[in-house]
From Swiss-Prot:
GATase cobBQ-type domain: residues covered: 248-444
Signal peptide: none
Keyword vocabulary terms for this entry: Cobalamin biosynthesis, Glutamine amidotransferase
Family annotation (PANTHER family): COBYRIC ACID SYNTHASE, DETHIOBIOTIN SYNTHETASE
Protein name: Cobyric acid synthase
Gene: cobQ
Pfam families: CbiA, GATase_3
Gene3D superfamilies: 3.40.50.880, P-loop containing nucleotide triphosphate hydrolases (3.40.50.300)
Entry keyword annotation includes DNA damage: no
Active site: C329, H436
Reported function: Catalyzes amidations at positions B, D, E, and G on adenosylcobyrinic A,C-diamide. NH(2) groups are provided by glutamine, and one molecule of ATP is hydrogenolyzed for each amidation.
Length: 494
């Protein structure tokens, strides 16, 4: 099990690297995180939700993602409330203050069931477990589902990861171990120092001191590695800055307060022809070549935030001046005329009205129902090129055209409920889709970008020889190469 001294210590990428490392050595790793809190989700082949980070780890391990690898997923909705997902299916919502009392027992059962299914499957391998946050939050430790309780249940060998970039690495390590019970300390078999900058020789005395004080070997010091995969926590998004001096196209993305599935945008970060710019509510939109409004865990509340800060008006003016806009899931819903919430899925329960005005840039009406749609899809797209696309749905709202008097609007897909686009005479467009992962389709993404390049007077670019899956595999290998170079693998895998 990979434990961390804090949130953001680097557990996810280290567990991901261990999966690929073991796979290289002929073993079959099986990633597992008992409970995760994230709005960056994936949908498996059975239409079940799981954290994107565990999907990434499964690809690193050479496995198909399955919800059993992440039996409990908490998806924050704001106001200290989260949607609770057990084994891929939504089972309710919970206030943070009530979560442990109301959901601890059923969560633990979901974790044990997920483990049992994985261990009884045809996969014969070694579990690579990832903890969450700090394992020694004394006020929560007795109700901690996914750290030391799970480690003791499985008698798992544990690695403690500390982030030296944050400072205070000695206190992080000593303090974490000091707060463990004797039977928990025995499980810690190694320590990894993460995100070290500079000459590692300068830290040799630090390694000696840590090993002397703890009696636990330091397995290695990982250098600062540029973030090559989407951060699990939206708080890290603004730290993910990209400066491409050769960029010819600027994509602006609205950083919604309750943003979800920002992994949809990941294919753009490795494109040297594109500059990405995050915009928070209250900031100036400027004049990007295209604006993307991503998914939201609370579409109506995020739309209200855009309205209050004036960003909605900026977006409308940008559209009037010929700006290109594309929304994904919640972003698509915001672009419509109305958003109706009769079952109070997103609205405040005490509100008398359930109808909310959208930006009215697309003639669609969204109604939030009680049933969540989650499924992988392969659909025929009609714009800007005709081809088959793969992606997944994950939404409560259903959208329909209010009327079809606007001759410019077309359905993006043969299945007309999945998205629409209006292409204007000046070649600008406003559109959107419910299909997450749409930009991972390489040919379609390139044609979409070429549409923007054409309007700007730039030449069309050819499709990259390296597709998105190949890029992901290459990055996983680069991550693992760095891991193997700096970590004592022989001790690690024993």
């Amino acid at each position: 099990m990979v434990l961390g001294t804090s949130s953001g210590a680097g557990k996810t990428l280290i567990a991901t690297a261990i999966c690929r490392c073991l796979r290289r050595k002929g073993e079959q790793p099986i990633p597992f995180k008992g409970q995760n809190m994230s709005n960056n989700a994936w949908v498996d082949t059975q239409g079940r939700e799981m954290a994107y980070s565990q999907a990434l780890q499964s690809w690193s391990a050479g496995l198909e993602p399955s919800a059993e690898m992440n039996p409990v997923l908490l998806k924050p909705k704001g106001d200290c409330t989260s949607e609770v997902i057990h084994l891929g299916k939504s089972v309710g919502t919970s206030k943070a203050i009530n979560y442990y009392e109301d959901w601890f027992d059923s969560g633990w059962e979901a974790i044990k069931k997920g483990l049992a299914i994985l261990l009884k499957s045809k996969i014969d391998g070694r579990l690579i477990l990832e903890g969450a946050g700090s394992p020694v939050e004394v006020n929560l430790q007795h109700k901690d589902l996914t750290n030391l309780k799970l480690a003791k249940f499985l008698n798992a060998n544990c690695i403690l990861v500390a982030d030296i970039e944050r400072g205070g690495v000695f206190a992080q390590i000593i303090g974490t171990i000091a707060l463990m019970k004797p039977d928990e300390k025995k499980l810690i078999k190694g320590i990894i120092i993460n995100r070290f900058r500079g000459d590692k020789a300068l830290f040799e005395s630090g390694v000696t001191w840590i090993e002397k004080e703890t009696g636990i070997p330091v397995l290695g010091i990982l250098p600062w590695l540029k973030e090559i995969f989407p951060p699990e926590d939206s708080l890290d998004l603004l730290e993910r800055k990209q400066v491409n001096k050769s960029a010819e196209i600027e994509i602006a993305i609205i950083k919604l307060p309750r943003i979800s599935n920002f992994s949809d945008l990941d294919p753009f970060f490795s494109d040297s022809s594109i500059q990405m710019r995050w915009i928070e509510p209250g900031q100036d939109l400027g004049n990007p070549d295209v604006l993307i409004i991503p998914g939201s865990k609370q579409t109506i509340k995020d739309l209200e935030s855009l309205n209050k800060t004036g960003l909605s008006n900026q977006i409308k003016n940008y559209a009037k001046k010929g700006g290109n806009i594309f929304g994904i899931c919640g972003g698509l819903q915001m672009l419509g005329k109305t958003l109706e919430d009769p079952h109070k899925q997103e609205s405040i329960k005490e509100q008398n009205t359930f109808s909310n005005m959208g930006m009215n840039l697309l003639p669609i009406k969204t109604t939030f129902g009680e049933i969540k749609h989650t499924s992988q899809r392969e659909e025929k797209v009609s714009w800007p090129v005709s081809q088959s696309l793969k992606g997944f749905e994950m939404h409560y709202g259903e959208s329909d055209l209010i009327n079809n008097t606007d001759s410019e609007i077309i359905s993006l897909f043969k299945n007309s409920s999945l998205g629409w686009v209006i292409e204007k005479k000046d070649k600008s467009f406003v559109g959107g889709t419910y299909l997450h992962g749409i930009f991972e389709n390489d040919e379609w993404r390139r044609q979409w970008i070429n549409k923007i390049r054409q309007k700007k007077g730039l030449n069309h670019l050819k499709i990259d020889k390296e597709n998105n899956n190949d890029k992901r595999e290459r990055l996983l290998d680069l991550l693992t190469d760095a891991f193997e170079k700096n970590i004592n693998i022989d001790i690690l895998i024993k």
